[in-house]
Amino acid sequence: MSLTEAEYHELEKQVNLDDIDFSDLEEQYEVDVGLDNYVVVDGAPIAPEAKVPVLIKVLKKLFNTVGKVVEGDEGIYMPLEDGKSKGYLFVQFETSEMAEAAIKQLHGKKLDQKHRLLVNRLSDIEKYGVEGNVAAEFVEPELPPFKSHGYLKSWLQDPQGRDQIALHHSETFGVFWNKKKSDPEPVFEPRKFFTSKYAKFSPKGTYLFSIHPQGVQSWGGADFSSIDKFMHNQVRLVDFSPNEKYMVTLSPLPITAPDSAAERAVFPFGPESYGHKLVIWDLTTGEPARTFALPPHLEGQKEMPWPLVKWSHDDKYCARQGPGALAVYETPSFQLLDKKLIKIDDIVDFEWAPAGVHLANNKSENGHHLLSYWTPESSNQTARVAVMQIPTRQILRTVNLFQVSDCKMHWQSEGKLLCVKVDRHTKSGKTIFTNLEFFKTTEKDIPVEKLELKEIVINFAWEPKSERFVIISRLDDGNLNSAIPKNIIDFYAPDVNGKGKSATSVYKSYKTITDKHSNTVFWSPKGRYVVVATISRSNGEIEFFDVSFDDSNKNAPANVKLLKNDKFSGMTNISWDPSGRFVATWSSSWLHTIENGYKLYEFTGNLLRDDSIDQFKEFIWRPRPASLLNSADRKKVRANLREYSAQFEESDAMEADAALRELIYARRRALEDWKAYRAKHASKAVKANEVQAEIIEEIKEEIIEEKEEIVE
């Protein structure tokens, strides 16, 4: 039965289509009209129409590396105008996930020297390109109000001159005032999950940094308020320039663009940083100053050499090592010095001088920037150690070495001396022994003194601002039984012969201690006192030495005396406080769970505290900046040292005994009350006894001589 046209229209009027559910049909025949699988690409080369097919073929091959481009003409559309391409194109992938991968991996990709591709979602272009979605006139962003963090070096104003320490145990982290034998005093309430890995002070103590999955957080001021955030996903390692201007972070994950446009708007990295893992941050602005990809030979390594970026003493230069070359950058531009690498075949390692060096033939007020490096032996050349001046790249001194197994470079704190520890092997290769090569950088032509040893040196440490040093060595006799103590401790100092310009010096061991397990050396930052320790899970030991014990003999270069020693099973770390007054040792749960906790000693070895703390991780002294006192100020302090010592001894006694502290405070209050009472009543007594004075002038005559004469 068929309906006439009139009957159909009548029936249509009777049926309400809004009451009919078409959802099943709509779902069955749904058509995808979304744009999520489309991307728009800017920055492509502008090519003549005849070469467009070739360009499309090249680009399609590139985009197929991250997904699958739709086949045919629909896959890539490149608009033309006036017989040439317009520099952008549209790419359609089979899925939105492929388009997302293209944005993350190819945004910022350099196609050649002149062209960098910018890949974005087509939906974002539509969103921001539609009229009305973006304001026609520029609206100046509102700057957030300035937030003061207080005086960032406020801890230096402590009346008692105390140092601050950071204690990290389990998931709790806190900063405290060191109170010697007493419990540390919290600077702020210790916090749980303050950091997800570890925390670190900047080299001069201005900032405290915590590590998180999202990046690094900086803290500072009297109450350690939040200062800045540095976004670097899954950051693992952190380092700083000596003057706290820059921070270096490393993550195992390459930098990629965030998913959303809103996140990309606040993302600190540009397309040129995508794929990089190493970031140098400007701590003043909080922005990245430069990013780097890891060298190919470091990709995939389980143990990463650190730091990857090394700094000159004044933050003026930084350098990083690559295969067969050294890259030196100038700050703050972080451009290559002279726009080229320093070619050094097979370079193994390098170190900057830790201070400006005053060369004998080229005086400079602030000293010169020097760095040292070494290269290994090859079939046609010997191993080589060289000292180079920056920025001239001039090689100032070279020493050729043979039968070399390894080298370690140790700069003296003032840059006046460089010791190169050269581990050499016999011709058979069965025995290792050490030579020490001393470069005297401030003397004419940088002479080199050699110290030949029969043993292999396992630890070397310079005394700060001195020419003395300590080494730990052992004889390489093939006996690998670690239970037998066979390490040797030697205390060296220069033995000077002659006077004036004709004087010569050679290094001489002034004390030797044999049959030890000791394996580490830690000098006081102020010199003279040194800790020699055995860091071991089972037989930890620490010994305190004074290398200038007999002050009566001023001409003796060294006079070594053992002050004290102590046992600490499971000891993993040792650290001096910045003032050289205290030494902290601790057992970290990061390495084992044996007797976790810390011990605090005076510089003479007297034990002050012994705290066993479950899951104790780390003890950190807060560093101090260099002293502002000049030589005259220091001389004045030394002259009044007895007076200052009495004040500090009284303060120490008060801290140690609460009852004594209250007694001293009570006596001080009573003395102040007496002084106030006396001043008040003495003035009253003067007023009560005041009498109106009258000045009377009285002339007295005295006969000195009487003489009688007769006048005729």
From Swiss-Prot:
Gene3D superfamilies: 3.30.70.330, YVTN repeat-like/Quinoprotein amine dehydrogenase. Residues 37-124 form the RRM domain. Transmembrane segments: none annotated. InterPro entries: EIF3B (IPR011400), eIF3B_RRM (IPR034363), Nucleotide-bd_a/b_plait_sf (IPR012677), RBD_domain_sf (IPR035979), RRM_dom (IPR000504), TIF_beta_prop-like (IPR013979), WD40/YVTN_repeat-like_dom_sf (IPR015943). GO terms for cellular component: cytoplasmic stress granule; eukaryotic 43S preinitiation complex; eukaryotic 48S preinitiation complex; eukaryotic translation initiation factor 3 complex, eIF3e; eukaryotic translation initiation factor 3 complex, eIF3m; multi-eIF complex. GO terms for molecular function: identical protein binding; RNA binding; translation initiation factor activity; translation initiation factor binding. PROSITE patterns: RRM (PS50102). It is found in: Cytoplasm. Keywords: Cytoplasm, Initiation factor, Protein biosynthesis, Repeat, RNA-binding, WD repeat. Residues 1-224 are annotated as: Sufficient for interaction with PIC8. The keyword rRNA-binding does not apply. It comes from the Eukaryota. Its main location: cytoplasm. It holds the Pfam family eIF2A. RNA-binding component of the eukaryotic translation initiation factor 3 (eIF-3) complex, which is involved in protein synthesis of a specialized repertoire of mRNAs and, together with other initiation factors, stimulates binding of mRNA and methionyl-tRNAi to the 40S ribosome. The eIF-3 complex specifically targets and initiates translation of a subset of mRNAs involved in cell proliferation. Component of the eukaryotic translation initiation factor 3 (eIF-3) complex. This is Eukaryotic translation initiation factor 3 subunit B. It comes from Scheffersomyces stipitis (strain ATCC 58785 / CBS 6054 / NBRC 10063 / NRRL Y-11545).
